A protein has these predicted regions:
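Generic enzyme active-site microenvironment
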Residues: 3-4
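Long, internal low-complexity/basic segments
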Residues: 74, 131, 141-149, 155-206
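C-terminal cap/loop subdomain of S1 sulfatases and analogous C-terminal strand-loop tails that border
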Residues: 8-31, 48-53, 57-63, 67, ...
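Short beta-strand-to-turn element immediately C-terminal to the catalytic PLP-Schiff-base lysine
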Residues: 41-43
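Catalytic cores of eukaryotic secretory-pathway lumenal/extracellular enzymes that build
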Residues: 37-38
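Ligand-binding/active-site lining segments
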Residues: 34
Length: 206
């Protein structure tokens, strides 16, 4: 398995512009796709038709998978291929990739992804939430009064995040903020605090 856990971090270009992870926007630690979308290659080092393990995970040679996957999926996938049983009270955040690596679509997998930075990282306190083709970026402490608290992109039409759509699709933006908030509460997430120590939870502001 060959993959990265984050985007490039070379000192090239603006952190939130187009540089080390081009054509994607941003770099390691940022809220944009260049900070979180990475290549992922899976292959058997030596394909063997008689191998029981390889029969348990038949990787489709030369196929390309477009369904969502995350680095958290590696652990449950390895457990599944190895035939390990997970205790019922043991929480695993990822999903088994066996069906996706065999070239199929896993219809049971939710098409959502949450990345949460309640602490300062490259100057921002933010959460990104993806649901299908849509991606929301929510800022808890905007760096300037003019900076919006939420950005909305359609990654299918605009993977480079050049066309911000929160004003054009306010209903979708509200829906995304609500879905993101529900997911954060479900995970028991921590939140940033203001100078008075008050917790800053997301809210629908338009």
């Amino acid at each position: 398995l060959f993959l990265g856990d984050n985007g490039g971090d070379a000192p090239l270009g603006d952190e939130r512009g187009y540089g080390s992870s081009a054509p994607l926007r941003g770099k390691k630690g940022t809220e944009f796709e260049g900070g979180m979308r990475v290549p992922f290659i899976a292959a058997w080092a030596k394909p063997e038709k008689k191998s029981k393990v390889q029969k348990n995970l038949p990787i489709e040679v030369g196929s390309m998978q477009t369904q969502l996957g995350t680095i958290m999926d590696i652990y449950p996938t390895v457990l599944s291929v190895a035939g390990c049983e997970v205790p019922q009270n043991y929480v695993i955040d990822g999903f088994d990739l066996k069906k996706q690596l065999s070239g199929k679509v896993d219809k049971k997998r939710p098409e959502s992804f949450l990345m949460h930075f309640p602490h300062a990282h490259r100057g921002s306190y933010f959460t990104t939430y993806r649901m299908g083709d849509w991606k929301l970026i929510y800022y808890y402490l905007p760096e300037t009064p003019k900076q919006p608290k939420a950005l909305l992109y359609n990654l299918k039409d605009d993977p480079e995040e050049r066309n911000e759509l929160s004003s054009a699709h306010p209903d979708k933006c509200r829906e995304m903020i609500q879905e993101m908030s529900a997911q954060l509460e479900k995970e028991g997430a921590l939140y940033p605090v203001d100078k008075q120590g008050n917790e800053l939870k997301p809210f629908v502001y338009f």
